[in-house]
Amino acid sequence: MKAYQILEGTHKGTIYFEDGIQARIIVSKTFKEDSFVDPEIFYGLHAREIEIEPQPTVKIEGGQHLNVNVLRHETLEDAVKHPEKYPQLTIRVSGYAVRFNSLTPEQQRDVIARTFTESL
């Protein structure tokens, strides 16, 4: 299975998994998340492949939580140094959307440390 992010056009920013038969929408402004579409919709669009690592299935008692922030490490580091350049930078923290600049410096460092990992 492969993952892709669309980089241009109407579906810009859409992230989906594809197995050759169908595409599963992960994040999108134009498709319902967790829906399945014909992957041919995306053929010919400028996209980048996203590396994914399949993990063995582990039974977890209780809930799970994942915040997805599609950002570059350098962007957040620059936002710490030059907050005036990023007045609208919004990130997900504990299920809530928050302006990065409204966080304390300690909270910003914590977000950066937890957002960028070598693997899941």
Curated annotation (Swiss-Prot):
Location of Glycine radical modifications: G95
Keyword annotations of the record: Organic radical
Listed SUPFAM superfamilies: PFL-like glycyl radical enzymes
A molecular function GO annotation: formate C-acetyltransferase activity
The Glycine radical domain, residue ranges: 1-120
Keyword Chaperone: no
UniProt-listed InterPro entries: Auton_GlycylRad_Cofactor, Form_AcTrfase_GR_CS, Gly_radical, Glycyl_radical_cofactor_GrcA
Keyword DNA damage: no
Function summary: Acts as a radical domain for damaged PFL and possibly other radical proteins.
Protein name stated in the entry: Autonomous glycyl radical cofactor
Organism: Enterobacteria phage T4
Lineage: Viruses, Duplodnaviria, Heunggongvirae, Uroviricota, Caudoviricetes
